[in-house]
A protein has these predicted regions:
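N-terminal export signals
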Residues: 5-23
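N-terminal intrinsically disordered, low-complexity segments enriched in P/E/S/T
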Residues: 21-192
Length: 192
């Protein structure tokens, strides 16, 4: 896909999500920002629609059911603040959002020790992560950076991120090597 076409499609995501009732959380009033699929017990949307779920379809994502969160639903979950040094400017920033495991639990995700997740960003970047690592490293789904909501086109609107400065095996690495498992512009999580 050409970069310009991708960026145009990405900027239209909120409009597509708002137009597709299956893409919004049951109690949500805004567009879906995050879709959880796979081994989940709760659902509020049906299967992928190849015509309307263009980004997922082009990234070869397939599912029969899912659970979506809009901004309000994510904001309603208990949130924590972390303060990692970011690779982009070498400065400490405050990132706030719910723990990834709390987001998964809200969707009724399978939480056994053997479970794993794939975290996928809008550009197709995907990270496979054992659920135990997500718990141990206290991944959050950040919605705010330095007290402000994160925008699409920056690191947001959602970023699966850790406080790498406080994880011993990562804190010893150069800053630009600490966030390889932290996709920004997160929009899909598959649980298996």
């Amino acid at each position: 896909m050409h970069k310009r076409a991708f960026l145009g499609a990405a900027s239209a995501l909120p409009l597509l999500a708002a137009a597709a009732p299956a893409s919004t959380a049951a109690s949500a009033s805004g567009p879906a920002l995050l879709t959880i699929t796979g081994q989940i017990a709760r659902t509020n949307r049906g299967p992928i629609d190849p015509a309307l779920d263009q980004m997922m379809h082009k990234q070869k994502i397939s599912f029969d059911k899912g659970f979506t969160f809009d901004y309000g639903a994510l904001s309603a979950l208990p949130a924590i603040t972390i303060r990692p040094t970011l690779e982009y400017d070498g400065k400490v920033h405050a990132l706030r959002g719910p723990l990834l495991v709390d987001v998964l639990a809200a969707a009724g995700a399978r939480m056994q020790a053997s479970a794993a997740v794939t975290l996928r960003a809008v550009d197709g970047f995907a990270v496979d992560l054992p659920l135990e690592a997500a718990k141990r490293q206290r991944f959050i789904v950040a919605t705010h950076l330095d007290g402000k909501p994160m925008a699409l086109g920056g690191l947001g609107p959602l970023w699966a991120v850790i406080d790498a400065d406080r994880i011993a095996d990562l804190a010893n690495k150069p800053v630009n090597e600490r966030f390889g498992q932290c996709p920004w512009a997160l929009y899909h999580i598959d649980v298996r």
